[in-house]
Amino acid sequence: MRRLGVSIYPEKSTVEEIKNYLEETSRLGFSRVFSCLLSVNKPAEEIKKEFTEINTFAHELGFEVIVDVSPRVFGELNISYKDLSFFKEIGADGIRLDAGFSGLEESIMTYNPENLIIEINMSNNVHTIDTIMDYRPNKYKLYGCHNFYPHRYSGLNL
């Protein structure tokens, strides 16, 4: 499955700038959006409003939306790994887990009733997937993806 994706950072750009960027990248054939909740420092309601607006617009353009999260995000927004409804409410098609879970949590999340994709960051530790598989996840909802965002030292060494 070959798809082109783009990264957006709502804490670094205005909603209007992001919408313009998504329109341009949509015209160029991109169909996947990677959005980041890791560095957002706003109240939950403000996050929900902003991300919902951006993600709704992205869906209108035909994008699939994946939101990057970590255990810290779950804690700060009071989200349980057994209840991922917050992410569905903001229009995410899936969440990308950077690190910090044991394997059991990721496995449980793959059975979420919101039908969200659970994507693992394969750039951190390729053995993470083995640990998750030990807990018998729903393999149809478990994806692996390497870093593709343009931050120095965020990709794999050659």
Residue ranges of predicted features:
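Active-site mouth loops of central-metabolism enzymes
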Residues: 1-19, 68-79
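Alpha-helix-loop-beta-strand connector modules within alpha/beta enzyme cores
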Residues: 44-70, 108-122, 158
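Catalytic alpha/beta core domains of metabolic enzymes, predominantly
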Residues: 101, 105-108, 114-158
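Short, acidic/polar
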Residues: 13-26, 76-86, 125-132
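Conserved beta-strand positions in the central sheet of alpha/beta enzyme cores
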Residues: 33-34, 95-96, 141-144
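Short, well-ordered coil/turn segments that N-cap beta-strands
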Residues: 1-4, 29-31, 57-65, 91-93, ...
